[in-house]
From Swiss-Prot:
MCR is composed of three subunits: alpha, beta, and gamma. The function of proteins C and D is not known. GO terms for biological process: methanogenesis. It comes from Methanothermobacter thermautotrophicus (strain ATCC 29096 / DSM 1053 / JCM 10044 / NBRC 100330 / Delta H). Keywords: Methanogenesis. This is Methyl-coenzyme M reductase I operon protein C. InterPro entries: Me_CoM_Rdtase_prot-C (IPR007687).
Length: 198
C-alpha cells in the first residue's frame, strides 16, 4: 500500500447495535495503540456516537494511534453537579479509569449543555491525571472549567479539584451530525500540538 498506513484495531468488547452492528454501544473499547483515547458518552436518544467515530477515523488517517471507549454510564450528570437528581447519573467504572490512564491524551466528546460538559469533564479529570481535549457543541471556554475547579492550560482555578488538565477545546461539533472537515482538521491540529508535534 503506497501512501497508506495500516492500523490494527482490537475491536470490540461488546456487540454493536443497529443494522449490521454499525453503532458502538456502551462498554465498547477499541484498542489501537496508547497515544490517544477518544471518549464517547453512552449511546441513546440524546447521545449519538457518530461524531466520535468520524473523529477517531480522521485521527487514525492522520497517523495518530487512536483508541475508542464508549462509557457505560455516560448519560446524565455527575452526582455533585447542580442539576443532579433529575435523571440518570454520569459515572466511571474502575475499568474505564484504568483504560483512560493507559493513554497519553484523552479526547472527550461531550454535548450541548454547558453544565453537563463542565461537570462531566471535572469527574473524568478528577480520576485521570492526563491532558485532555474537550470536543463539544456548546461554546465553552477555559474559564468555564476553571470556575468549578478544573485545571486548564490557560486558566488555573483557585482551588484545583482535578488531577488531569484541559489543554484545548473544540466547540461547534454537533452530536449526531456529520463532523465538518474544518472541525476534523482543527481536532487533528490540536491533538498533534498536545502530543508535542506541530
Amino acid at each position: 500500500m503506497i501512501g497508506k498506513c495500516t492500523h490494527v484495531v482490537d475491536c470490540r468488547e461488546t456487540m454493536g447495535m443497529g443494522e449490521g452492528g454499525g453503532i458502538a454501544q456502551r462498554g465498547t473499547f477499541a484498542q489501537c495503540g496508547s497515544e490517544v483515547l477518544a471518549v464517547a458518552m453512552s449511546p441513546g436518544r440524546r447521545h449519538i456516537t457518530k461524531p466520535v467515530c468520524e473523529i477517531t477515523f480522521a485521527l487514525r488517517e492522520a497517523n495518530i494511534m487512536t483508541s475508542t471507549i464508549v462509557l457505560n454510564a455516560g448519560a446524565g450528570v455527575p452526582q455533585d453537579a447542580p442539576s443532579a437528581g433529575a435523571g440518570s447519573l454520569f459515572g466511571l467504572t474502575p475499568a474505564e479509569v484504568e483504560q483512560m490512564k493507559r493513554h497519553k491524551l484523552l479526547v472527550v466528546h461531550l454535548g450541548g449543555v454547558k453544565n453537563h460538559i463542565t461537570y462531566k469533564a471535572r469527574l473524568i479529570l478528577r480520576n485521570v491525571d492526563r491532558p485532555c481535549i474537550i470536543i463539544c457543541e456548546y461554546p465553552v471556554d477555559f474559564e468555564d472549567f476553571a470556575k468549578i475547579g478544573v485545571r486548564t492550560r490557560a486558566v488555573m482555578p483557585d482551588e484545583p479539584k482535578t488531577k488531569g488538565t484541559i489543554v484545548d477545546i473544540v466547540s461547534g461539533v454537533i452530536r449526531g451530525e456529520t463532523c465538518p472537515q474544518e472541525k476534523l482538521d482543527e481536532i487533528i491540529r490540536k491533538v498533534k500540538l498536545a502530543l508535542g508535534g506541530a
